[in-house]
């Protein structure tokens, strides 16, 4: 993986419009083959979609799980992130750390290692996301189980999941 240095807030991934932060951007770069030295790549296992966003998507799709999945895939393909264009909201993800950029590995106080289970504490509306496959949609809890990847920027907040915590 290429190890370029990116902006700690992720502005290097903004495609449109230039000059804004990732949350305000319409489209961000979710190319997972291009990883920066101050980014964390995670294998994503589930998305917890913001309740207002999930409700809007579900209603627009008549509650049909296949259509809900297609709409989510479409949003991410178009925008590079899960940010509902109607509500503006995102959610958070759960996953496993797959790669840590070189600049972060030696950063004082950095406590992650590859293989750690984490939850993101920053919105999906600002997180580069690539979905390879939707495995299940849990309408009762606004959760979508996926196979995919996400990038956390140097400034991102996250929480490690304790080993004894149930999924």
Where are these regions (language model features)?
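NAD(P)H dinucleotide-binding glycine-rich loop of Rossmann-like/cofactor-binding domains
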Residues: 91, 117-167
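Intrinsically disordered, low-complexity boundary segments flanking structured domains
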Residues: 1-2, 11-13, 84, 142-148
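Cytochrome P450 core scaffold surrounding the K-helix E-X-X-R motif
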Residues: 52-57, 129
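A short, polar/charged loop/turn motif at coil->beta-strand junctions and beta-hairpin connectors
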Residues: 20-22, 36-38, 91, 152-155
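Glycine-rich beta-strand-centered segment in the early N-terminal region that forms part
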Residues: 33-48, 59-124
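OB/S1-fold single-stranded nucleic-acid-binding modules
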Residues: 2-24
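Short N-terminal binding/cap micro-motifs at the start of the first secondary-structure element
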Residues: 19-26, 50-54
């Amino acid at each position: 993986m290429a190890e370029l240095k990116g902006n700690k807030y992720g502005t290097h991934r903004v495609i449109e419009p230039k000059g804004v932060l990732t949350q305000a951007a319409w489209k961000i770069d979710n190319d997972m083959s291009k990883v920066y030295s101050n980014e964390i790549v995670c294998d994503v296992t589930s998305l917890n979609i913001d309740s207002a966003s999930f409700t809007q998507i579900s209603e627009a799709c008549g509650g049909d799980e296949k259509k809900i999945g297609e709409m989510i895939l479409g949003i991410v393909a178009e925008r590079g992130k899960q940010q509902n264009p109607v509500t503006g909201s995102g959610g958070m993800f759960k996953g496993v750390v797959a790669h840590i950029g070189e600049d972060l590995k030696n950063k004082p106080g950095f406590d992650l290692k590859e293989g750690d289970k984490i939850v993101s504490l920053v919105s999906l509306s600002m997180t580069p996301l690539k979905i390879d496959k939707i495995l299940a949609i849990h309408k009762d809890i606004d959760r979508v189980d996926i196979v995919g990847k996400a990038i956390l920027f140097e400034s991102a907040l996250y929480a490690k999941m304790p080993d004894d915590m149930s999924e």
